């Protein structure tokens, strides 16, 4: 079975390729803009191309049985059309919570007629890197909405679900909401980061206007969207869990384990 991974050197795409290799997939194709610098596992066939330029996907799609579709809204309809024309038998797409900004990906995949699996993760644990500069400067996190609650997921766990869906026969037609294994407040996340880093951390609650100024320097115009999300999670805490373990059978990554593995991002 031939598997094509688009966005293969992106954060999650690279993890999908690695997980497919670990699971013993023998015919993996990786689409990336710079094959010479891809540094992917031995045995992976690397194609030059980008899902943002659909014509470059054409050589890689021929003979493909299943495809991992990394998110790219501007060209998703054309990429799906090309996959259908090439006879791809199953698309596993990375979108987001149903009805959110990534919904057009699921709509395009379903419209093209190829059997599908939707991956719908919420927030990634890696979003904690928004605090990296603050942690390098000291032990205080300045942010708003300390009581916002959700269950962020490790990107590695999303990749494991993607690889499972790509290799499991007869499983299309599922939409998988994905979270981490525990619901945590922002304040609790900071406490766990401190445990991983070996020093106590403090969450200093800022008024929204001050937090907007802080995070506009980090995120630009996305800072408003970030704070809107925290406000929503304060009013409506996300406590329903959909851990990857329910699909893969492997333990889902806890926030503390993720923080210990990625402590270098904050030092």
Predicted regions and their residues:
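Cofactor-binding loops of NAD(P)H-dependent oxidoreductases
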Residues: 48-50
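Oxidoreductase cofactor-interface core, primarily capturing Rossmann-like NAD(P)-dependent enzymes
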Residues: 2-42, 52-58, 62-65, 74-90, ...
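Periplasmic-binding protein-like
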Residues: 68-70
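A hydrophobic C-terminal alpha-helical subdomain
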Residues: 209-267
């Amino acid at each position: 079975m031939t598997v094509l991974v688009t966005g293969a050197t992106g954060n999650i795409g690279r993890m999908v390729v690695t997980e497919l290799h670990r699971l013993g997939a023998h015919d993996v194709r990786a689409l990336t803009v710079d094959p010479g610098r891809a540094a992917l596992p031995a045995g992976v066939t690397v194609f030059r191309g980008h899902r943002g330029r659909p014509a470059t996907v054409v050589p890689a799609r021929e003979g493909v049985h299943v495809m991992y579709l990394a998110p790219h809204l501007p060209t998703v309809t054309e990429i799906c059309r090309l996959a259908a024309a090439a006879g791809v038998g199953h698309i596993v797409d990375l979108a987001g919570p149903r009805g959110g900004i990534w919904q057009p990906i699921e709509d395009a995949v379903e419209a093209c007629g190829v059997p599908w699996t939707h991956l719908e993760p919420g927030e990634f644990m890696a979003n904690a890197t928004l605090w990296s500069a603050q942690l390098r400067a000291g032990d205080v996190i300045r942010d708003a909405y300390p009581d916002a609650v959700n269950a962020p997921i490790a990107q590695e766990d999303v990749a494991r679900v993607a690889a499972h869906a790509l290799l499991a026969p007869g499983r299309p037609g599922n939409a998988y909401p994905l979270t981490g294994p525990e619901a945590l407040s922002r304040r609790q996340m900071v406490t766990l980061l401190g445990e991983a880093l070996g020093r106590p951390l403090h969450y200093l609650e800022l008024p929204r206007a001050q937090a907007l100024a802080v995070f506009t320097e980090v995120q630009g115009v996305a800072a408003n969207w970030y704070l809107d999300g925290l406000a929503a999670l304060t009013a409506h805490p996300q406590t329903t869990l959909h851990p990857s373990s329910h699909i893969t059978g492997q333990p889902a990554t806890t926030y503390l384990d993720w923080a210990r593995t990625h402590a270098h991002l904050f030092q």
